């Protein structure tokens, strides 16, 4: 599983390839398990952010904290497009730009969903 292929280019960076290098015969599903944990944790964060945004009064510090966690998780598996959206969202939080946060969060959810589908296909194809 050392080549993430063209369909994943732009979605995953070298961090994902480093995870693949840690996978061995003793733990053949390591990358898939790490990815599953990422999607479980990120679903929780998306839910928390959704709830915070639905309140209408924006707590930019709380939103930034959630997004900081999301960015860290995304960085750890090499989710480059999701990570980029996290960075943009945090910039809007620091600027107090609610509309920018809302717009970026929609794009982040789209990139996250696309990544999930691509990884599911990738793991199925590599079995």
UniProtKB/Swiss-Prot annotation:
Pfam families linked: Hpt (PF01627)
Primary localization: cytoplasm
Alphabetical list of Gene3D superfamilies matching this protein: HPT domain
GO terms for MF: histidine phosphotransfer kinase activity; protein histidine kinase binding
Protein name: Histidine-containing phosphotransfer protein 4
GO biological process: cytokinin-activated signaling pathway; phosphorelay signal transduction system
Species per Swiss-Prot/TrEMBL record: Arabidopsis thaliana (Mouse-ear cress)
InterPro entries: AHP1-5/YPD1, HPT_dom_sf, Sig_transdc_His_kin_Hpt_dom
Record keywords: Cytokinin signaling pathway, Cytoplasm, Nucleus, Phosphoprotein, Two-component regulatory system
Domain topic, free-text comment: Histidine-containing phosphotransfer domain (HPt) contains an active histidine that mediates the phosphotransfer.
One term under GO cellular component: cytoplasm
Modified-residue entries (Phosphohistidine), positions: 68
Reported function: Functions as a two-component phosphorelay mediator between cytokinin sensor histidine kinases and response regulators (B-type ARRs). Plays an important role in propagating cytokinin signal transduction through the multistep His-to-Asp phosphorelay.
Coiled-coil stretches noted in the UniProt entry, renumbered to this chain: none
Locations listed in the record: Cytoplasm, Cytosol; Nucleus
Record note on modification: Two-component system major event consists of a His-to-Asp phosphorelay between a sensor histidine kinase (HK) and a response regulator (RR). In plants, the His-to-Asp phosphorelay involves an additional intermediate named Histidine-containing phosphotransfer protein (HPt). This multistep phosphorelay consists of a His-Asp-His-Asp sequential transfer of a phosphate group between first a His and an Asp of the HK protein, followed by the transfer to a conserved His of the HPt protein and finally the transfer to an Asp in the receiver domain of the RR protein.
Expression by tissue: Predominantly expressed in aerial parts of the plant.
HPt domain boundaries: 27-122
Subunit structure: Interacts with the B-type response regulators ARR1 and ARR2.
